[in-house]
Amino acid sequence: MTIEERAETASYYCQECGAAVTQAFADQIPVEAETLKKLGAGYAAGMGCMEATCGALIGAVMTAGILTDGKGTPAVSRQLVAGFQEKCGATICKDLKGIETGRVLCSCPECVRNAVLTLGEV
C-alpha cells in the first residue's frame, strides 16, 4: 500500500485521530491492530479537551517511535511537527478546528491524512 493510499484509508475511517494514524501503519508494527487502536484512542480531540496537540500528530509521533525502533526518534518527531504545521497551519486541536477564531484550518480527516503523509515523508 502506498503512503497516499494509507493516508486516504486512514482519513476515511477517522473516528479517533491518533488511532486512525497508528492503524494506517498496522502492517509495519509488531503489535495487534486492536491494541494499536486502543493505544491511540485517548488522543482524539486534542486529548479530549481540544487544548492539546492534535491526536493525529501524536499518533504519527507514537508510530515513528516504533518504526525507528527508538533510534533518532526525537529528530523524526521534530520533522513531523514541522511538516504537520506546514500542511495544516497549526498543531493544537482547538486552533486547527477554529474554536476561538471561527475559521477551521484543517478538518479531522485532513489532519489524519496529513499526519500519515508527513510520517511517510520523514
Region locations from a protein language model:
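Polybasic, low-complexity association/targeting segments
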Residues: 1-11
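Generic structural signal for well-ordered, non-membrane alpha-helical segments
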Residues: 10, 14-18, 36, 70-73, ...
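Acidic-glycine-rich active-site phosphate/pyrophosphate-binding loop
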Residues: 21-41, 85-93
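Buried hydrophobic packing segments
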Residues: 21-25, 57-68, 115-119
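Phosphate-handling active-site elements
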Residues: 27-39, 65-79
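Glycine/serine-rich anion-binding loops at beta->alpha junctions
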Residues: 43-63
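Catalytic phosphate/nucleotide-handling subdomain of diverse soluble enzymes
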Residues: 55-56, 60, 66-68, 72, ...
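C-terminal binding/interaction regions
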Residues: 78-122
